[in-house]
Structures are given as structure tokens and as C-alpha cells.
Amino acid sequence: MAKGIRSIRGFSDILPEQTPLWQFVESNIQATLEAYGYREIRLPIVEKTELFSRSIGEVTDIVEKEMYTFEDRNGDSLTLRPEGTAGCVRCGIQNGLFHGGQPRVWYAGPMFRHERPQKGRYRQFHQIGAEVYGESGPGVDAEMILMTARLLRCLGLEDVRLELNTLGTGEARAAHRAALVEYLQAHEDRLDDDARRRLHSNPLRILDTKNPDMQALVEQAPRLMDYLDEDSRSHFQAVCRVLDQAGVAYRVNPRLVRGLDYYSRTVFEWITDRLGAQGTVLAGGRYDTLVEQIGGKPTPAIGFALGLERLVSLLEESGISGPQSGPHAFVVSADSLRALPLVEGLRDRLPGLRLQMQTEGGSFRSQFKRADRSGAALALVLGEEELAEGRFGVKDLRGDAEQQRLDPEALSDYLARRWPELAATEVTD
């Protein structure tokens, strides 16, 4: 017997009993985004490698170690997208989306990073992200954070907390970087291998170290907040004031720097303690120089992304599940081939009807067991007599209503009257 083929490590299947919760999450997020004026954009999952090295940063972990990169038959270097923002910007430049407007877009789909799989971290993972272009003031920063707070509330998540920081302008970061490198060089004997590697290429990321032996050193490091220009400082204070007035709790975390080089000014994360080290549920920030960096005209921008696997895991732990949309009715037939045209006619009359049948047939006993397990409220019976007459027997599976026999038109009227109570009770199959 041939050896079975299994999924790749870090790539997971999402099974039918799991998808209702995913659909619940996705539909609620989509409704919230569209209520704030965002429109969906659909992007390729493969882009030129240069797009990510120019946007994310050549010395970031993502570009150095985590991207799935390959050469195609033309010799071009291509990469499975590790995140969505760079592709969104590329699309906006290529298709003229930034000309004379302030587009708001959202996207959803799989991303790919060659990381070590663990709870909350996968090599293929699903993100939903949203981006706003052309708005530079603190109002859009505050609105986006308030929108993410509403989005998480709509999903029923309560034990998440908000952390904020500002990364200032490029000039402020350059001044802070010089002071930070000088400080770290003076304590180089206390740096771990990863920090030594980053010292001259990306020292800001050292502040985000997870090494407990370096926490005290990092706590005493120069703070970016002390190097901010006045515009960045007042911008951040305005964002915080709006959150205060709206009653959204937050903590300013000066070590919050995000893992992508393109961020500037406001950055934020919603985090939880329930996912171990992978505690970030949703994160984002402003990236005012990225559009120009990729080849467009200077365009301010802000965005966020959330990981669906982490969000779904949190909801499952909280006992939240999506609606199980089983059939309204289950067809029990003596001959499925003769029954199918009658069933299709019923679907034509009631397009919203969820109707399931066992096309392989089987005994009435086994079909009724299957009907009961499906969660359907009704069984529509097509025995030999019903098939000969072109009528349906109607049996109530959840109540004690008397069984009756109806022609297709009368059955359509009957189902329409009972529509509010026909939702499936529970799918147990």
C-alpha cells in the first residue's frame, strides 16, 4: 500500500466543524470594516521578492530567515507574501488608487513565513488587514484604533489589552539610533548573539528582545520618546486624548517597535496572555514613507492586520462558537434518482432553503437517523407512493405535528409559513 501523504509542517487544514467559527469571525470583521467605509481588495499571494526586501527591510527576520522565496522559469525571484501591506501599496501605485482620493481598503487571505510552528504561529496563516491612504492627521490613527476596539468587542473578546507607542519621524529615529548604538556598544559584553547581529543593522529591534537576561539592559536604554520632534509628540498626544475621551484603556509601551521597518509615528497592538509568547492578536501603525519607498508619490498611510488563527483560538478558549448552519429539511427517499428532480423543483421555489438528501439511498431507518443527526427540523419523505403522485410527505422531527402529504406548491407555502422556526437546532453528524 502506498505511503499516505500528509500536510506540510506548519500548514493546517480547517475542517467542516471548524469553519462556522471562522465564517462568524470573518463576517463580523467584514461588517465592521464596511461600516467604516472600507472596501475589499484582492491581491496575489506571490509577488516579486524585491517588493518585500524594499518595504519590510533587508535586515529584518522576515526577509533574512522567514520568506518562502524561489526562482521561476524566467529566473525572476518570487516570494509567497509574508504580509499584506506591501502588496496593497504595490497595487495602489500600479492601479492609480492613490490619485485624488483617500482610499480605504481591506484584504483577507493566507500569508507565509518559515517560522518554527507553535501555538499561535504557523507557516501558513490567515490575515485580515485594512489600510487607509492619504490621511496624515491623528484623527485617522485614533479612528482606526477605536474601530479595532469595536471589532474585538463585536466578536466577544474582552481579555485583550491595547498598547501604544510612537516611532516619530525618520530624523528622530536616526538621532535615537545613534544614542542607542552608543549605549549598547558600551555594554556589548551583555548582548546575546542575536543582539550583536542587530547592533549595527537594526538596533531598534533589540528593544523588542524576548531574552530575560537582557531585560534590565534594555530597560535602561535611551528612549525614543526623548528624541521625538514636536510634531510627532503632539500627534501622539492627540491620538491618546481621543482614546481617553472614548473610554478606551491603553498603556504606552516605549519598547513597542513592531517587526517591520516601514512603520513611523503611531504603532499599536492588541495583546493577550492566553497565547503564550505569541500574544499579539491584532497590530498596526502608520507608514508614511512606504508608498514613496516602493515607487509612488509621497502618501501618508496607516493600517492594521490580525491573525485569524490566533483570534479563532481565543474565541474557542472563551467558549464562543459560530452558528452551525445545518439543513432546514432532510429528504428521505425510496429512490434518490427519481427524487432529485422533485427536490430541485423545490429548491427553485425556495432558493434560501437548506435541503439535504442522502443520494446513495439506504433504508428509511438509516435515512431517518441521518436526518435526525443533521439537525434538520423536518423530514421530507418521498416513498414509492409520494414519488408516483409527485407529492412530499412532511414529518416534524422536533415536534409532534401530524404528518401530512403535500404537493410541491402547497409544500412551498407551508415551508414559507414555518420559515422562522426552521433553523437547524444542532448539527451532530
Curated annotation (Swiss-Prot):
Catalyzed chemical reaction(s): tRNA(His) + L-histidine + ATP = L-histidyl-tRNA(His) + AMP + diphosphate + H(+)
Protein name listed in UniProt: Histidine--tRNA ligase
Disulfide bonds: none
Upper lineage: Bacteria, Pseudomonadati, Pseudomonadota, Gammaproteobacteria, Chromatiales
EC annotation from Swiss-Prot or TrEMBL: 6.1.1.21
CDD domains: HisRS-like_core
GO CC terms, sorted: cytoplasm
InterPro entries linked to this entry: aa-tRNA-synth_II, aa-tRNA-synth_II/BPL/LPL, Anticodon-bd, Anticodon-bd_dom_sf, His-tRNA-ligase, HisRS-like_core, HisRS/HisZ
Species name: Alkalilimnicola ehrlichii (strain ATCC BAA-1101 / DSM 17681 / MLHE-1)
Record carries keyword Cytoplasm: yes
